[in-house]
A protein has these predicted regions:
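Conserved short "hinge" loops at termini or chain/domain junctions
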Residues: 1-71, 77-205, 211-291
């Protein structure tokens, strides 16, 4: 049985979730893309949760989201082969802007479905116990930004559950690399300094996004960030896109460093709340007071 049959019984069912597929397409043509897509999604939600959702008898929200994500990711991966096949057979020709529009739509469909799926895994009791046992979820306790909403308040990620959970290891890496010590220092000096903690979280969010830009495929980025590289794509080359990605990552790192430097400056200033002067030694039981 083909991997694609994990979630789709036939092409007609597949077509319900994936727009714009050829009328004569066969599952055998999509097999290699399906293997890659299942591996990619299973790496995020774990093979155990994939199996649990796949084996559900009724059509649950989680199964619908997974079908949407799986189907659209398959087509995103196989689209280029489909177009080349049509061109070779001279049955159809697809312009570059049409190819890019289809590609973006499959990415958007996949991303939105995965966002909804991860939110469902987090909030639905049927899945949440297994989801919270995953390695990345357990790492949340070590992080300074522990929710999607909190991260989104510092750097706009379209409230993307997918992006937030994919960046858990990145946030941990940045904290272990030294930024975590600054959070500890701020709390040890004055736990009430929420302004300094907020500035450090702002810097942390920017460093996380910068690291994601250098390590993630573009389909793993929120729509707001992807849109920065999608405009006027027909007139740009792959190297142009990569340069824009690297430039944005560099800008974010520089901005984060400036914020961190400002916090370091505040922490290095002497504490003026306990000023020692001659009158500080006056005590009521002294016969002679220092004036």
């Amino acid at each position: 049985m083909s991997v694609i049959n994990d979630l789709f019984s036939n092409v007609a069912e597949f077509r319900k979730y994936v727009p714009g597929i050829s009328a004569n397409i066969e599952f055998a043509e999509l097999s290699s893309s399906a293997i890659s897509a299942r591996k990619q999604i299973s790496a995020i939600i774990t093979p155990e949760l994939w199996k649990l959702i796949k084996e559900e008898v009724t059509t649950t929200d989680a199964k619908e989201y997974l079908r949407n994500a799986f189907g659209n990711l398959i087509m995103h991966k196989s689209l280029i082969f489909d177009i080349i096949s049509k061109r070779k057979s001279e049955t159809a020709d697809v312009y570059k802007h049409e190819f890019e529009a289809m590609r973006r739509q499959y990415i958007d469909n996949y991303y939105n479905a995965m966002d909804s799926l991860i939110q469902e895994l987090t909030e639905n009791e049927i899945y949440s116990s297994k989801w919270k046992e995953t390695h990345d979820y357990k790492l949340l306790q070590e992080l300074q930004i522990q929710t999607t909403a909190d991260f989104n308040s510092y750097y706009g990620i379209d409230l993307s559950y997918l992006f937030f959970f994919r960046t858990i290891p990145l946030q941990r890496e940045i904290l272990l690399d030294g930024l975590g010590d600054m959070f500890t220092e701020v709390l040890s000096i004055d736990p009430a300094r929420a302004d300094l903690t907020g500035k450090l979280k702002l810097a942390l969010s920017q460093l996380v996004v910068a690291l994601a830009l250098s390590r993630f495929d573009i389909i793993e980025l929120p729509a707001t960030i992807r849109s920065l590289f999608d405009d006027q794509k027909s007139s740009r080359s792959a190297s142009d896109e990569q340069n824009r990605v690297l430039r944005l990552a560099a800008d974010l790192r520089e901005n984060a460093k400036s914020i961190i430097s400002a916090v370091e400056l505040v922490l290095s200033e002497p504490d003026e709340s306990h000023i020692v002067s001659e009158t500080s030694f006056n005590r009521p039981d002294d016969k002679i007071y220092l004036i």
